Regions:
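Acidic anion/phosphate-binding donor-loop and adjacent secondary structure
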Residues: 95-98, 136-151
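Conserved donor-binding/catalytic core segment of Leloir-type glycosyltransferases
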Residues: 4, 152-166
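Conserved donor-binding loops in enzymes that form glycosidic bonds
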Residues: 8-9, 88-90, 134, 161-166
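Hydrophobic anchor at the start of a short beta-strand
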Residues: 33, 83, 127-129
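Alpha/beta-hydrolase fold active-site loops
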Residues: 1, 82, 157
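Extended catalytic core of nucleotide-activated donor transferases of GT-like folds
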Residues: 4-6, 37-121
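Donor nucleotide-sugar binding/catalytic pocket of nucleotide-sugar-dependent glycosyltransferases
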Residues: 107-118, 125-143
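N-terminal subdomain of nucleotide-sugar transferases
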Residues: 1-40
Length: 166
């Protein structure tokens, strides 16, 4: 089995991080993986040397393609035995889009969590689906980091949040 992974792993975004971790996890599991970037912005994000090595490999002989992007960007390709969609959504459904139509052309769909699976079912996606969480290299959490020294925050309550404002 040889897998072609197409995704935005060079974009410096959360999507890029997910694609990066997926590619490295496939490689660590012993899958013969080749990756190709899908550029969705003009940011040059950090890419590990291992990813660049996998990117330099030939895509000849790939029998599975994983498309890690938004469903309207996906396309079925009959040259592969399997066309896998790996996608994210933060909505309860996507009925009023072409996403289900595009997804239903593919062989199977992978989603990171139950809520995306539920949104897919609610939107009439009928291909076989699987929950494939975004992998995480836990070694980075065992590393010791120097605390940030921000003088004007000394002896003050500091509230951290990770969020998105749209």
């Amino acid at each position: 089995m040889k897998v072609l992974y197409i995704g935005p792993y060079k974009d410096g975004t959360g999507w890029a991080h997910s694609a990066h971790e997926n590619i490295l996890a496939l490689d660590a599991a012993g899958v013969d993986v080749v990756c190709r970037p899908l550029k969705l912005n003009n940011v040059e994000g950090e890419v590990s040397p291992k990813i660049l090595e996998l990117e330099s490999k030939s895509d000849k002989g790939c029998d599975i393609v994983i498309q890690n992007c938004l469903p309207h960007q996906m396309d079925y390709n009959g040259k592969f035995d399997k066309n896998i969609a790996y996608y994210f959504t933060e909505t309860s459904h996507f009925k009023n889009s072409t996403w289900a139509e595009r997804l239903n052309l593919l062989t199977e769909g992978w989603v990171p969590c139950q809520s995306v699976l539920d949104a897919s079912v609610e939107s009439n996606v009928i291909i076989p689906m699987a929950i494939v969480p975004v992998p995480c290299d836990v070694q980075k959490y065992q590393k010791a980091y120097e605390p940030l020294n921000i003088p004007h925050l000394k002896d003050k309550f500091v509230f951290y949040t990770i969020g998105e404002f749209s």
